[in-house]
Amino acid sequence: DKADTEEVTKVDETLRFYQIDDIKFLNGMAGCRAYASTAGFESICEAMYLGKPVLMVPAHIEQDCNAYDAMRAGAGIISDSFDLESLLRFAGRYTPNRNFTSWVRSCERRIIFELEETMNVVIDEMYMVESFV
C-alpha cells in the first residue's frame, strides 16, 4: 500500500509481497488453483465469483463472521493457520457454488427493480400542492 516501495518484494523463494493493484490481483486470482486469505469480505466474494476454493484464517471478529458465512456457502474451509496442504486437499473435492455467480450477475437487475418499485410507491404517495390551496 506504500507507493514508494518496489512493485514486488521477494522475501525468499516461497514468499513475495506485491503492491496493491486491483486488476493484477483479480487476474492472479482468476489464474490460481485456490486462494488463502484472512477472510476479508471482498476477496472472499471475488474468489466465490471466480469459483476458487478458499482457505480462511481470520484474525479478528469481522473476519470470523465472513469466514463462517463463506464456509456455510461452501466457499472454503476455516483454519487457525495457513495450512496449504489442507487447502489443496479441499480444492480436490471443491465444487463452485454457481448459484452465487448467478445471484451476483442478477444484482444490477434486482437493484434497478427495487429502485423502480420505490419510485412507484413515492409517486403514488405524492400529492399536489394545488389540492391544498
What are these regions (language model features)?
Residues 1-2, 37, 56-58:
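Short beta-strand/turn micro-motifs composed of small residues
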Residues 1-34, 44, 64:
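Donor-nucleotide binding loops and adjacent catalytic segments primarily
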